[in-house]
Amino acid sequence: MKKQLKRIFLRLLPGWIALMLLIVFVLPTALAATLGTTGRILDQLPYLTGVTVSERISVIAPFFTEEVRHWDEEINRWAQQYDLDPNLLATVMQIESCGDWTVSSPAGAQGLFQVMPFHFAAGENQIDPDTNAMRGANFLNVCLDYSEGDPALAMACYNGGQTIVSKPSSEWASETRRYYQWGSTIYADAGLSKDTSPALQSWLEAGGTYLCDLAAQSLGLSG
């Protein structure tokens, strides 16, 4: 029996050796060539289809103003980087700056997400879009933790600070109550994938248009 098994093993050995050589030397080369071809095809997709990368990956609602949609690709990247819903980031940017990365408030809030100076580390460029987004997103995540994941309450926290989470809305500052109203309704429309937002239109009519006009000038989008 042992001799029979030995003969079978010796008969199959060359085939096993050939298979191992194929796996070690041939398969990696073939796989690399296949992946390289696939990569080249993917690289050519924008030219073949006329669709740019940013258009393919756009995930924010289409009703946000042109000034906010100008930052679409960055919003998507920041959302992934800081584990946030891109529509939530877009809603905060819409209300805070309408996409004007140079704007500052009388209270000292800076940039796209109107981040207060005490959130920044010494020496940081407070209006740099990536730095501003990092600090704004970090604080928004803090607010989501305080609000136990409630995005509307997190936006109120973003405006009024963490202490408002434990207070009834009747004790909030009027600015925070307005922020909560605008933010929650605009974000709700975005979550429903609407093409238009009555809430955003109301915000624009209540004074948001002026902010967006300034943003358009800053971004070179005004006619």
Q: Which role does the model predict for each range below?
A:
Residues 32-99, 129-131, 137, 194:
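Export/targeting segments at the very N-terminus of extracytoplasmic proteins
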Residues 22-33:
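Hydrophobic alpha-helical membrane-insertion segments, chiefly the h-region
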Residues 94-97, 116, 139, 149-175, ...:
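Acidic helix/loop microenvironments that form the catalytic cleft of cell-wall polysaccharide enzymes
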Residues 87-91, 103, 146-157, 194-197:
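Surface-exposed patches in mature extracellular/periplasmic domains of secreted proteins
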Residues 104-124, 135-138, 180-183:
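Substrate-binding/active-site groove segments that recognize
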Residues 183-201:
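A cross-kingdom feature marking charged/low-complexity
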Residues 199-223:
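Low-complexity, Gly/Ser/Thr/Pro-rich intrinsically disordered linker/tail segments
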Residues 1-24:
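N-terminal Sec-pathway targeting helices
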